Every structure is written in structure tokens, then in C-alpha cells.
Design a protein with these regions (language model features):
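Solvent-exposed loop/turn segments at secondary-structure junctions
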Residues: 66, 74-77, 121-123, 154-156
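Short, low-complexity N-terminal intrinsically disordered segments enriched in polar/charged residues
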Residues: 21-62, 160-167
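Short beta-strand edge/turn micro-motifs at domain boundaries
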Residues: 132-159
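Short, cysteine-centered beta-strand-loop-beta hairpins and adjacent loop/turn segments enriched
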Residues: 94-96, 122-130
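Bacterial Sec-dependent N-terminal signal peptides
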Residues: 1-31
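A short hydrophobic beta-strand element
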Residues: 111-120
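A solvent-exposed, acidic/Ser-Thr-rich amphipathic alpha-helical stretch
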Residues: 34-38, 56-112
């Protein structure tokens, strides 16, 4: 009698475990990486054009309202308003006429999220290269449009040595 009860119970437990542990496959649409690269490069080009035009509002449109930007040698800027304020300050203080170019190097995408690895080059008005580096931007698609949620950048050029203190 006990064997008759144990067998169905064991079969039931085994069935439950196999069912619970099996992964359900969900169909996801593959991301068209070439189309995505063109879209993100367009955003980078618009960012550079807005910087060159000294339009802080257009530059800040790249970012989500809750974005955080981790720039070199300063505290993170939290929120689009703070990022815009920093951009406006930089634009106001700039008297060089230098401009930057941004290029997509690599993209990783999943669902509504994209991570971009890019390169930047800062040039003088004549087009001579002054500085360069790399950046990483994390985008989320919100209301059908990608917005930068986090970004950070580094310079590839070695830092200039600090001046020696006067003795």
C-alpha cells in the first residue's frame, strides 16, 4: 500500500521540479545593429553640432531628466537641469572656438537599452587635434526615443605634470 502511494507522490514531485526548473523561451526581436548605430551616431552628431552652436538646451536634450553625467575631474552632475547648467557655464566661459567630434566605436543592445563605447576628439577652429579620449553612454528607449541615462568620459592624452612648488 505504501509503495502505491509513494510512486505517485514521487512522480508528482519530479514533474513539479522539471516543470518549475524549465526555462520558458520568449521570442525577442533581434536588434538591427546597423540601424541602431546610425541612430546613435546621429545623436552624437547632433550633440556636437549643438555644442559648436553654443546651444546648451539642444545639448541637454541628449539626456533623460534623471540622467547622471560623470565628467572628468569634477563631481557627477545629477539630472538634465544640472547637466544643462554645467554645459551652459562651459559654453559661456569658452573663448577658444574649439569643438569636438564624437564617434561610435561599439554598441551593445538588449531590449530597450543600449550601451555605447565611443571616442571623442577636441579640435581647434583650424581642425588641429588638441585632445582625445573615450566615453561610455548608457541609453534607454523612452516614449520611442533613446535618451542618455548615464555617461562618463576619460582623456587618452596623458595629464600634464603639476608645476613644481616654489621653494
Amino acid at each position: 500500500m505504501r509503495l502505491k502511494i509513494k510512486v505517485p507522490v514521487l512522480i508528482g514531485i519530479a514533474s513539479f521540479l522539471f516543470t518549475a526548473c524549465s526555462s520558458s523561451k520568449t521570442e525577442t526581436n533581434p536588434v538591427d545593429m546597423e540601424k541602431l548605430k546610425t541612430e546613435i551616431q546621429g545623436m552624437e552628431d547632433a550633440f556636437a553640432a549643438a555644442e559648436k552652436a553654443k546651444d546648451a538646451t539642444a545639448v541637454a536634450a541628449y539626456y533623460s531628466e534623471d540622467a547622471i553625467s560623470y565628467a572628468r575631474n569634477k563631481a557627477p552632475e545629477v539630472g538634465r537641469a544640472a547637466i544643462k547648467e554645467s554645459i551652459a557655464k562651459n559654453i559661456k566661459e569658452d573663448t577658444t572656438g574649439n569643438h569636438s567630434e564624437y564617434k561610435v566605436v561599439d554598441l551593445f543592445a538588449e531590449g530597450n537599452m543600449v550601451v555605447e563605447i565611443g571616442s571623442w576628439t577636441n579640435m581647434n577652429p583650424a581642425g588641429a587635434r588638441l585632445d582625445s579620449g573615450h566615453y561610455m553612454s548608457f541609453f534607454q528607449k523612452r516614449d520611442g526615443k533613446y535618451l542618455c541615462v548615464r555617461d562618463m568620459n576619460v582623456a587618452s592624452t596623458p595629464a600634464k605634470p603639476a608645476a613644481k612648488p616654489v621653494q
